[in-house]
């Protein structure tokens, strides 16, 4: 079905109603049916209408294939109630329609509903207001600028409608104009946001994306200026990568094929080349995904449920969930059987299904911390957060555990003051910052060195700086002037008073990682005694009353340990899950359909980047993907594999926030790993978006017939009575003359019958007969001359009979 996309905005349900009813009345097959020994034409049965309308809704781009047959029956009942269809006796106004062979037909009246002329007050920050200055470009002819009075008479309303129609006609006269470059860029931005909202299934993008950050010219450039491999081609070469960086990246990506052995090489040559590339990207003024889009990409990961939970804790939490909610899976199909009294609600439910918000599903969106502190946070806070993430968390897996990737702040029990949950996706480490006192107490208990002699290890390699922060090649914080040491039993400490953030929260939780887990440039081998001691310290069977902040800190440590369990040691902690000896006991919660959603959403989000950043991201992802898959690549680090090194090195130069306190290194690492696995799909040009823009531009530039040039209705011209009599006689005589000629020229008619018909004609129309045969000669000539004397009889010779002799 050739349909247009109904954009989210005012009167969307009315537009959907007009769209569906228009196609239903125009294309629904009508035929002859028999019922109760009678035949009825131009009608259809209820079952035929349900089958045809169901297929129509499934193929329509506004609804999709998720429309059920029961929803189609509800829509047909609304059609019967609103007089879109009626039964054979002309009855309508009720919803008494079943899936049977009852006959229905279309009435003569049009079911199209008029759209109110007054637009609502738009929010200044809403997505629909982004291209507000080009409102006339996407304006429908049914919209009216003038609002009629509520209590006006019928005549005044008709006059008002005529004035509005004339005004729309004047506006349509200059409508098929040439679109400017700015208009086409606005179309690119508008359609991109529509597809992104449809992919995520959110009612609005306000909680995910700031409309002021959208630059349609970037989207258009990234879609149109590409090479045959899909890489952005920059017209301004000043923003491109330097030639020496491109040469180094090409050398590493094609190692050892592209390595010219004629040049002087030495041991560790590939490490120096890699360090050169890493130095360039880590010294960029901002990350490749830019600071302003940090929230966008993190929210995409959170909305899609991109969290991993180990099996050791998963069983306990799942049992806990089942005891509180014994049958949560039955609530998924409530919308299929839900009855809508409002036609608008029914149409909008067909467009997109959003499950009802429930208090039992809070833990799926907020993770483990929310489960332990659910009683201390008000209901409205959870409702606000669930509005953005609730549907995708439940859609990912019912009864499973979400990840603790939100920044939740709780207060002490004795104060009774509850802090507000932040709407944005924030750092796991930010939780520790919000309760710094108790976190330091927890860290001092966890990281307390033993009485044994500590072993010192100085970071000797030169750190690579990113902005104002010191970074090692592995991407973890390490300052030149800080001396790290490790105790023999596995504890951590520092000579400086304040612990580095990656050490204080991240590195203290490496007890469950493999033996080759990297921490900066130091290789740490966790001992069995440390693991046993930390498991005992974090034992969930501790029933002693503790302070609320300490409870939050203990849950934080457990959650961060669980998330880091499969991120650092394994080569890939993403879907599809990989079996690795270092990542045993982990289970991925990202379902296959949500993985596809994440790929499509990130594909559109990467189009919002500046062209220079998108090109650098494409080349970087190609390089690190080839390096991680290259078996001939020498080891670039003594303590970790190539893939882990790529992720830890370039995670901060790909995704980073302006404020260090909000940086979530775990999500950044997972995003880079996800980009490595799916960079060919994410960073390619979406063909469907380009087709949608071209179709919309052609729709706006199509030639139109001006209103009023061709009359829509034709009326008979009034004539006088004399002219009517003259026309009546002339037309009648001409027809009678034609009848006479047919009798005369009919050769198949016998002469006797022809004479009989001519006599009858002469008796009825003597004047016309006289004009055709003025004399008897002309009449005789018609039959020809025939002799009146009979021919003499033939003389037959009589036979002679012989006499009979006796």
From Swiss-Prot:
Residues 142-177, 564-588 are annotated as: Disordered. It comes from the Eukaryota. Residues 24-108 form the DEP domain. Residues 279-319 form the Rho-GAP domain. GO terms for cellular component: nucleus; transcription repressor complex. Pfam families: DEP. GO terms for molecular function: GTPase activator activity. InterPro entries: DEP_dom (IPR000591), Rho_GTPase_activation_prot (IPR008936), WH-like_DNA-bd_sf (IPR036388), WH_DNA-bd_sf (IPR036390). Residues 167-177 have a biased composition (Basic and acidic residues). Transmembrane segments: none annotated. SUPFAM superfamilies: GTPase activation domain, GAP (SSF48350), Winged helix' DNA-binding domain (SSF46785). Gene3D superfamilies: Rho GTPase activation protein, Winged helix-like DNA-binding domain superfamily/Winged helix DNA-binding domain. GO terms for biological process: intracellular signal transduction. Keywords: GTPase activation. This is DEP domain-containing protein 1A. It comes from Xenopus laevis (African clawed frog). The lineage of its organism: Eukaryota, Metazoa, Chordata, Craniata, Vertebrata.
